[in-house]
């Protein structure tokens, strides 16, 4: 079991939680980004720097992740692809992306994108909050407890 992070847009607070968790739980954590990432020195944490371009980091995560892995991303199309491979997604606000819910979430995302393009709806998600950070921490802990107890 490994944790992959779509790191370019991942909030700093979430990365810090992931660093501490990877070292405490001794779980492999890989941040994938198209820019340099400053990470703590740990045998459990590394980075993969990909080239610039649309979906380059996403494609690398899809290529490398395996069934049972956890992918941290707010990118719903990426979450759909990794769920198809048997991985689970977790967004920085603590929402899990699973086989049971990803198609509905993807449909809602596509609808909202159309409404924004038509000018019917404006704006995006609220700013990342302390409650989001707590929700993320709780879901991460639950997922790891379930996954690591199966090993």
UniProtKB/Swiss-Prot annotation:
The coiled-coil segments of this chain are none
Q: Which residues cross the membrane?
A: none
Top-level lineage group? Bacteria
The Swiss-Prot or TrEMBL record describes its family as follows: Belongs to the UPF0178 family.
Protein name per the record: UPF0178 protein Desal_2673
Per the UniProt record, the source organism is Maridesulfovibrio salexigens (strain ATCC 14822 / DSM 2638 / NCIMB 8403 / VKM B-1763)
């Amino acid at each position: 079991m490994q944790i992959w992070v779509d790191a370019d847009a991942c909030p700093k607070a979430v990365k810090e939680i992931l660093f501490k968790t990877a070292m405490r739980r001794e779980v492999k954590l890989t941040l994938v980004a198209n820019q340099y990432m400053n990470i703590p020195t740990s045998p459990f944490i590394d980075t993969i720097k990909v080239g610039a371009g649309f979906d380059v980091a996403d494609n690398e995560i899809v290529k490398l992740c395996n069934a049972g892995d956890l992918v941290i991303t707010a990118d719903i199309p990426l979450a759909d692809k990794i769920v198809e491979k048997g991985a689970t997604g977790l967004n920085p606000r603590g929402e899990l992306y699973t086989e049971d819910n990803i198609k509905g979430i993807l449909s809602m995302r596509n609808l909202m994108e159309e409404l924004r393009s038509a000018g019917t709806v404006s704006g995006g998600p609220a700013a990342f909050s302390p409650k989001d950070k707590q929700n993320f921490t709780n879901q991460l802990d639950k997922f790891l407890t379930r996954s690591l107890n199966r090993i």
